[in-house]
Structure formats: C-alpha cells, structure tokens
Amino acid sequence: MSHTAKTILVTGATGRQGGAVAARLLADGVPVRALTRDDSSAKARALAEAGAEVVVGDLDDRDSLDRATAGAWGVFSVHAGAYEGGPYGHDLDHESRTAAKLGAAAKAAGVEHLVHSSTIGVGGPLEEHMDMLQRKAEAERAIRGSGVPHTILRPTSFMENTFDSFRELQNGALVSLLAADTYEPHIAADDIAAFAAIAFADPGAHAGKVYELAGDDITQAEKAAIIGRVVGREVPYVAIGVEQVAEDSPSTAKMLGVLNEHRMAVDIPALKKIHPGLLTLEEWMTGIGKPLVDAYFARIDAA
C-alpha cells in the first residue's frame, strides 16, 4: 500500500480536539485529510483554506471511511459518545461501533499508525462506577482489536470548556457540580494536539502507549481563584449539590458523587518530559486561551 506523503486522516476535524490536531499537523507541514459530515460549514471551509484536504464522511458509514482512509499513513480517531441530551441520544453502542468501523477501515487501508482520543478514568477504579467510562473502554478495545499500531490519549477536562460550551462560568461566578475541594485535572486542546503530533512523528516510541493527559490539577476553589487573579476581578465559587441534579439526571448525579470521592491523579511531570510546553490553566488563560477568556468577560460586561 502506497501512502500519500504520510497523509494523516483527522476525524472530528471541525470539533474541539480534531480541529486542534488538524491545525497542529498543518503547522508542522504534515498533509492533513479532514473528515467532516458537512464540507460547506465555516470550519470545514477554513480547514480547506489552511491547506487541508476536506473529505465528506460519517464515522458510522464504513464505505465513507474506506474512501477517507485510502492512501492515508495515519489516523487521528475521536468519537462522540451517547449521553443525556447529546446528539446520539441513548445509542450507547455508537462510540464503540464507530471506533470499530474506523479501525477496520484503517487496517484495510494499511494505515501505519492511529492515535485514538479516549478519556481519563478508563481502566481505573472509576470505570466500574461510570457508564461513560465503560463505553470509552469499549471503544479503546475496538481500536486495540483493529490490529493497527496505535497510541491512546486519555485527556482530562478541557480548559476551553470553562469559558465556552459547558458554561461553568455564569454571570462571572464559577458554578460547579463538584465540591470546592475536589481536584479536577485540566488540559488544553492544543496540548492534546501536541501529544498526537508527537506520537505521529515518532510512532515507534509511542506505539502501544497510553497517556493520561493534563497540564494542571486543581481544586474547584483554586480554579476560581486562578480565574479571578488572571482577569483582575473576584470570581466567586458556587457549588451545586449533587442532590439538586439527581431528579433530572440520575446518571449525572451518580457520576458527580464518584468524582467527589475519587481523585483522578495524572503524572504531569512525566508528561512534561515528553511535551515540555504543557500548559497550566493560568498559562493557557494568559496565552493561547486569552481571546476566549476576553470574549467571555466582554459578554458579561455588556449584559
């Protein structure tokens, strides 16, 4: 099987992780084939303008995956899971099914290395308590069973989500379902992309490896203090008790109870030996994350 200049297929290319990986690889001069369900979207057009080959496909459609992986040297694999209110509803097999289809297509195409993004907690004591982790574990097993050389990344909470989609900040306060003294590891999407690029650049050193990714490990109270220090204003911490969400979402309440009781530790010093530029939350907020932070507080001030 001949490969086109070590082209890497990036799934989820218009999303948080896939978009960061595509941008990082393009910046490194790596040919990128970006998979999207809609090549007319603004993000897809931006990828094309940045130099990516944009292809239309669906992770649940094996034929489209065969076309997308043809001639690719590598694949970045990221899959949306099923959760309450999510796009796949209660299709609990979606993640493992699409991972299996992608792995099979990659194997058939002769892909030489696959980097799969999962989540922290898989394979640990939390897995038996959390359905989401069990589904992530099933997806990992599908990738391992594909026979394609691979690296698995297990990122923690995205720093970007604090100021964006998860709306943890509400009216200038940090509103959290976790207790004030509960530790929560965080990672920047750009650092996930950096680890993916490192694995693709030296697959021999990273094949078969699993990396749990975080650049910072802080309590909710510390997080509020860091945000307040960076933006120069008081950011109160407001806790939402588990009992307040139990009626509407029992699964979320169960997950929060487990997270409040079990710390998810990450070996950040070991990660920095691989990627010395790993960012803390404060470094991210004052650096590449500053536009997102500024935009959030500008909206607060304008309200």
Q: Residue spans of the language-model regions?
A:
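Oxidoreductase cofactor-interface core, primarily capturing Rossmann-like NAD(P)-dependent enzymes
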Residues: 2-46, 60-63, 67-72, 80-96, ...
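A hydrophobic C-terminal alpha-helical subdomain
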Residues: 24, 206, 230-231, 242-303
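Short, conserved active-site loop motifs that form the nucleotide-linked donor/cofactor pocket
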Residues: 51-53, 150
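Cofactor-binding loops of NAD(P)H-dependent oxidoreductases
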Residues: 57
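Short secondary-structure boundary segments
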Residues: 79, 118, 239, 262-264
